């Protein structure tokens, strides 16, 4: 890989992409308010609502930067770039798909009951995160890409 500014400053590269991604996603949330396609299958109707699912949902958001920084600091630099480039490219392609064909989900319960931390967190999440721009799933893509990075990384080949 050429030794340009981004390769010399991988944290700067991640910060640059983070700002780009958040700006693009914010634009999508503000400008595409009704999906062209509602994504649904009968299996969706069989999945019960579970307010405790917010725990792994929010853990997912910590898992991404943790993995990026872990590979940056512990693994050979090539392992970091083998994660970073496909991850960011896939997220950008997903954003383009959302512009071309907006999708949405209609799976949320009408009301979330309870006053515990989980119910309050779900209500806050529903108020701030629209059920739009869901297919292709960035959550699924990122999870698969991160797991592939762990499986392919040289640091896990060594005996412990």
Residue ranges and their predicted role:
Residues 1-66, 110:
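N-terminal transmembrane-helix/juxtamembrane module of multi-pass inner/ER membrane proteins
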Residues 1-3, 66-81:
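Cytoplasmic juxtamembrane interface segments
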Residues 29-43, 73-159:
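Membrane-interface loops
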Residues 54-68, 84-92, 142:
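Hydrophobic alpha-helical transmembrane segments
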